[in-house]
Amino acid sequence: MGKALIIAEKPSVASDIAKALGGFVKKDDFFESPQYVLSSAVGHLLELCLPEGVEVKRGKWTFAHLPVIPPHFDLQPIEKNAARLNVLLRAIKRKDVDRLINACDAGREGELIFRYIVQHAKAKQPIQRLWLQSMTPTAIQIGRAHV
């Protein structure tokens, strides 16, 4: 059995998870244990492409065509966070990562941050949710038990 990649929304949350679950070794931009690889975003890493940035093959548009609701929204990396995105993309593509665990904040923005990363990476692994009500070690351990 491979490892699960846990993606938190921010580095402080990843650090709290590593401490609460124990057994992690800090590498450059992530933590690793026999069961898990643990890393984080730093808030939003990707954003929707503006219409003029959309690929031409999807067709040109003008304001006369509005409203336009495309079947697919293209994403682009946010420049200042590109290095962190690359860390996560490499982790997702690791051969030993066989599932992804969303440990981003439980609200809409946290879910969106995680889903954009998964979409951009074209990840095929199954996804699980680490739902954390608080950041206490006990709450994190309970959350892991219910993934």
Enumerate the language-model features and the residues they cover.
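Intrinsically disordered, low-complexity regulatory segments
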Residues: M1-R144
